[in-house]
Structure formats: C-alpha cells, structure tokens
Amino acid sequence: MKRRLAAFAIAACLFAPVAQDNDTLEAKVRAYVPVVSLVKVCDIRINEAASGDHRAMLEAVKSDPNANKLAYRLHYETQTAYIKARDGGQRVAFCKDFIAANSQYAKARFTAVVEGHLSDVSTSVQKAIAHNVCGAPPAKLSRADWKPYAQIKKMLQSEQKSAKENAETNGWNVTEETTAVTEQFCAAVKTR
C-alpha cells in the first residue's frame, strides 16, 4: 500500500508543473480572448505588454486542444454578448463597461490617441482643452499655443463626425456615440 502511495506521490509531482502551466495558460486565455474579440467593434487599443502576452498565449494555444476550445468558446460568448447588447440599443454602455473592467489590458482607442497627442503639447494647451471640452477650470493660452490647441480640437471634431456617420450608417444612437467619443477624450485629458 505504501508503495502505491509513494508511486502516486511521485506521479503527482511529475504532473504538477504541467497542471500549473495549464492553469496559467487558461488564465491568460480567459483574460485576453474577450479583449481581442472586441477590439474592432468596441474600438479598443491593447497596451504593449498585453499585446506581447497575447501573442505568446496564441502560440501556446495552438498546441493545447483544451485551451483552443476554451478560446473559441470565449470568443463566441463575447461576440454573442456584444451582439445582444448592440441589438438592444446598449452598445456604448456595453463597450464602456467592458473597457472599464479590462483597463489593465486595453483602453479606448481614441483615449490612447489623445494621450499620445497631449504628451506633445504644453500644459496650458491641456488645461484649455480640459476647460473647453470637459468642463475643467478656465485656462489662458499664449499665442504660440493656439495652433496645437486648434489641432487637438480639430481631431476631436473629426472623431465625433466619424462616430456620427458610423452611428447613422449602423442605425445606432447618434447622441450616445458622439457623447462616448467626448467621454473618451476627457478620460485622456484627466489622466494628464
């Protein structure tokens, strides 16, 4: 009896690292597949660290049939939930909640773009944009700051126009879509 228990203990020790690797892979599949599944429809930009991890996870999934099935099922469930929300008129709320819940992996694409542009302008431009678009306290602009201010403002207007056209084309709520763009913009401004 002791011999059998010893053999079982040895076998369990041999398979423990494999089980641990499978658990790690499963956790990564559960984390990344829904995010990547909604990149296009929710207009998400994945951060660099998550993008690298996702590529590594995809390579590992190719050799593990159980992980592959899980990835497929999660993608299907995520897309189904999105379609249900979209068809129920809740697309923006669904995407907003999803991005908030997965903020460690991704953010709204427009928020990421605005953050990139804001890092190149002065703080007075950032404060003026925050005041005029997001309701922050007033700020003064120097003559040199008007051009970058106008460029960022034009970028916002262009994104809002695009959101409006997409909403009209797809039969979505125009006000909700353009408001979401403004909220994404203000989220980037507030992180500064």
Predicted regions and their residues:
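Positively charged n-region of N-terminal signal peptides that target proteins for export
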Residues: 1-4
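Secretory pathway export signals and precursors
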Residues: 9, 38, 89-91, 129-130, ...
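Immediate post-signal-peptide N-terminus of mature secreted/exported proteins
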Residues: 20-52, 112, 117-139
